[in-house]
Amino acid sequence: MSHFENLSNYTRFKTIEVKVGPIAIGGKNPIHIQSMTTANTMNTSATVDESIRMIDAGCKLVRITAPSKKDAENLANIKNELRLKGYKTPLVADIHYTPNAAEIAAKIVEKVRINPGNYADKKKFEEIDLSLIHISEPTRLTS
């Protein structure tokens, strides 16, 4: 049966629950609104301001791209600014091509989202996968 045959009587895919900071996603939890910033991650104030607007609009998770190691390192500044302003919303690092950025981000934010299709070197992807297991943070792998 398709999950979209009758839009007034839908069923959700069965998933396991995962904690992202204080938020539980998957399982029988409600669907949480999330969005991704468009500001340059190296522009801390612009990313913080955009994140605050998203949170105030109802986002429960804020995704921030971290395409480089420097971007990943700057996630600490972004997170610190948000926490100083009283915002505790979990942050998600969106990683695409840089395995080292994922390793850095995993030590800073509540979740790391990785698309393995963007990793050309399978060996590098396996290396990052093992390092994230030791950190015990949620990691989303998509293909």
Residue ranges of each PLM-predicted region?
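Glycine-rich, proline-tolerant flexible connector loops at the mouths of alpha/beta enzymes
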Residues: T38, C59-N80, P116-F125
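Generic structural signal for hydrophobic
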Residues: T47, S51-M54, I78, I104-A105
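Single conserved hydrophobic/aromatic residue that forms the stacking wall/gate
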Residues: I133-S143
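Hydrophobic, well-structured modules enriched for small/aliphatic residues and gly/pro motifs
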Residues: V92-A102, V109-D129
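Active-site mouth loops of central-metabolism enzymes
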Residues: N29-A46, L91-Y97
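N-terminal amphipathic alpha-helix/helix-capping segment at the start of soluble metabolic enzymes
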Residues: M1-Q34, R140
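Short, well-ordered coil/turn segments that N-cap beta-strands
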Residues: K28-I31, G58-K60, K85-L91, I108-E110
